[in-house]
A protein has these predicted regions:
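Two-component histidine kinase catalytic core, primarily the HATPase_c
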Residues: 41
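Thiotemplate assembly-line natural product biosynthesis machinery
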Residues: 1-24, 76-80
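Phosphopantetheine carrier-protein modules
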Residues: 17-34, 54-60, 64
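DNA-binding alpha-helical recognition surfaces that contact promoter or target DNA
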Residues: 51, 73
Length: 80
């Protein structure tokens, strides 16, 4: 994992913890909604990522962004 990947991963995790402290035990590769994230918190995270990384997450992609790992890859791809 390169430095950018690690920075983005840490930012995503820390953002989720700020949204709700119960999210500090999430697994990177497991479905976020199966781990207890609700849709409101998911949209809060998307908003935070759009603001921080100056990107726009397409609504059609929401269903694909169901793990922390997929969100990280999406942000990396959009930033390039």
């Amino acid at each position: 994992m390169n430095t950018n990947e690690k920075i983005i991963e840490i930012f995503i995790i820390n953002s989720l913890i700020k949204i709700n402290k119960r999210y500090k035990e999430l697994e990177l590769s497991q479905n976020l909604f199966n781990q207890g994230i609700d849709s409101l918190d998911f949209f809060k995270l998307i908003f935070i990522l759009e603001q921080k990384f100056k990107l726009k997450v397409n609504q059609k992609d929401y269903n694909k962004l169901n793990t922390l790992k997929k969100i990280k890859k999406y942000v990396l791809k959009k930033k390039i």
